[in-house]
């Protein structure tokens, strides 16, 4: 499935494809994410890579999915979602390749994930980032996400969870 978007001028050729964690398009993004987690939080990339994949059943349609943003055949950004509760999707593994940052691709990815989850009937998005990811915090703050208390999730070593939500519909009750 290809998802059209109306990206900023720098990303006119970015297109989104549905994938799985085992997809060759997802592998370089997950490997780089594991490397960066190791740099920011400690541990080894292989340790982080062992827990990064979300169980495939949780990403299966209609409840979940993984979108990879591809530019000229190269995966540059990606993110997943899974059912959190009856009206909420949880965003997971939001990532943009280091070589493609500061070009608006993460914002375009969030817009694509928001459109896809809304089309699947979700009314709210929830996500957790870590205290050593200020770029992610800034992205979510700038794109209309609101900080909320994290559901019970213990801190792990240097990782302190920071939770965000965004309502996709204005008529929430």
Model-derived features: where do they sit?
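Active-site acidic-Proline motif in GNAT/NAT acetyltransferases
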Residues: 97-103, 131
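Acetyl-CoA-dependent GNAT
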Residues: 3, 12-92, 97-98, 110-112, ...
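A generic structural signal for beta-strand entry/edge sites
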Residues: 86-88, 124, 161
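Conserved GNAT acetyl-CoA-binding A-motif
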Residues: 110, 117-129
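Loop/helix-junction capping segments adjacent to catalytic residues or to phosphate/diphosphate-binding pockets
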Residues: 24, 103, 134
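Conserved catalytic-core motifs of GNAT/GCN5-like acyltransferases
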Residues: 21, 49, 126-131, 137-163
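Conserved G/P- and acidic residue-centered "switch" motifs that form tight phosphate/ATP-binding loops
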Residues: 73, 104, 121
